[in-house]
């Protein structure tokens, strides 16, 4: 079984499948790994595409931002797909965003942009004109384009696109493959889409035990408390006993057993996102 002794891992393992090209765990590692693959391809002179997929939750990890920063500097060609199923980064998909995504990837637009900048730089006071144009463009993009953060880092941003729109995703992938340097495609998805129990309780189905397909309920309800249940009870009691006790979690409040503590002592509960290094040092500072 999955995630059971003697069974399959919950994460990619090369020894388990030839389709798993990288051993990893937890989250926030895909951009770093993808960048490494892309650079190795360039060093060896090979020719293949590299695509890294990362979720909006995993993007909160510091390692992901370190990789984005390095990717922008190295300018290796590879595609990053941001699977955003929590709408935590931008608003809903809109017609304007779709229009901008298509317009900005057109060859005519990219060629025109390069020609205009080259021409202006050759004119008297051209550099000042370019500077003013860039400032105006930046201000407009801040208002209209949800991916301005990535653009400022030096990574081409495409999207957002509806995750259920296969044609739209294929179109952006084809366009991204012709752009030099790292490209991020922002895909908006709905966790559990098409399966009502998962749509109602997405967190419960993040990592689940065997369940009945019709009801979504566990097939074998647990009788005994597990480690997480016991930890949850102990933390609640400690919080009751001592007002100096705080709880810090690196995302996944339910999985770490801190939901009850959070509900009872919200002012003493801190979810720092998937940022384990920060969580440890932050906790040390709190102590």
Task: Please annotate each region the language model reported.
Residues 86-231:
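Long, well-ordered, tryptophan-enriched scaffold segments
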Residues 189-287:
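Non-catalytic terminal/interface segments that mediate subunit docking, oligomerization
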Residues 1-74, 227, 243-250, 258-259:
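Cofactor-binding active-site loop characterized by glycine-rich and histidine/acidic residues
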Residues 54-60, 82-88, 164, 191, ...:
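Acidic, glycine-rich active-site loops and adjacent beta-strand->loop/helix elements
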Residues 34-42, 78-80, 239, 280-287:
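Proline/glycine-anchored alpha-helix kink/cap motifs
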Residues 1-5, 73-90, 108-111, 270:
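A glycine-rich helix N-cap at a beta->alpha junction
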Residues 61-83, 97-104, 198:
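A short alpha/beta connector and helix-capping loop motif
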